[in-house]
């Protein structure tokens, strides 16, 4: 069984790999550029979870975005596309505060698409992130995810 690693630290090359994985599933209009996602991450380094394979390559990822309440509502009410989110609409986590969270761009490299271990590793990464937030007394007021593909 291939060794997988949950990852929370990324550079622009990692985000380019994630963007390319997304291009294998989504239309260009539904994809945020790697450069913009890097800005999200620079503002709040707990906005992305990845899975690396034994070769240290990113093979799966999800963005977990603490959005400003108005932006969250606009996406929920279909007035805004998630690909249009820019870094100044992302919140920085502060201890003892609450946030509106959007799970965005859940993507798995097609070679690993139906790999149970990859999927469960990515979900474990999400749970670990939520545990990190709990330890800082950060509350999630609302959470939302949207599916764009059929698997």
Question: What residue spans do the PLM features occupy?
Answer:
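Conserved acetyl-CoA-binding loop-helix of GNAT-fold acetyltransferases
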Residues: 103-108, 113-132
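Hydrophobic, Leu/Ile/Phe/Ala-enriched alpha-helical segments that form helix-helix packing faces
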Residues: 19-26, 125-137
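Short secondary-structure capping micro-motifs at structural edges
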Residues: 36-38, 47-48, 87-92
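Amphipathic alpha-helical scaffolding segments
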Residues: 39, 64-67, 124
């Amino acid at each position: 069984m291939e060794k997988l690693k949950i990852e929370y630290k990324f550079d622009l090359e990692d985000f380019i790999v994630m963007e390319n994985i997304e291009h294998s599933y989504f239309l260009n209009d539904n994809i945020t550029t790697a450069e913009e996602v890097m800005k999200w991450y620079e503002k709040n380094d707990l906005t992305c979870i990845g899975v690396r394979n034994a070769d240290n390559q990113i093979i799966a990822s999800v963005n977990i975005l603490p959005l400003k309440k108005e932006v969250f509502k606009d996406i929920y009410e279909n007035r805004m596309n998630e690909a249009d989110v820019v870094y100044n609409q992302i919140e920085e986590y502060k201890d003892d505060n609450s946030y509106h969270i959007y799970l965005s761009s859940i993507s798995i490299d097609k070679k690993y698409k139906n790999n149970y271990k990859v999927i469960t590793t990515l979900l474990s990464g999400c749970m670990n992130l939520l545990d990190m937030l709990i330890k800082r007394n950060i509350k999630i007021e609302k959470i939302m995810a949207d599916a764009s593909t059929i698997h």
